[in-house]
Amino acid sequence: ALVIGSDIVTNAEQAAHVNGMLAHADETDDSHAPSLSHPGCAVVPAAMAMGEREKASGTQLLRAVALGYDLCARINLSLHPYDFRQAGHSTHSFGPSFGAAAAASLLAGLDYKGMRHALSYTAQQCS
């Protein structure tokens, strides 16, 4: 997968990570105020990298991004984000991690069990 703004091609995981860092680098990333999150800098790079790897169509990519944004917001909202943040946890990375995992899992064609495992792994990484 391509690292945006360069001619570097690497695996999907590394491209998603680098592109996510680039998306957040200038602090102009999107915000979802009710969930205290920035979904785009995690969801979009993960979806683009996996979409490139899997040769996804534009429709498939948009569907995955929409799923990622939705899950990101719902996860954070379910945790009562202001209380979650007050307890010392990062709302900016928690929900977006789940959104990125869901988007990438959808594009990878994982079945229900595979997606469940991917989200379980995400929960372990966020804890």
Where in the sequence are the language-model features?
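N-terminal core-entry segment
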Residues: 1-127
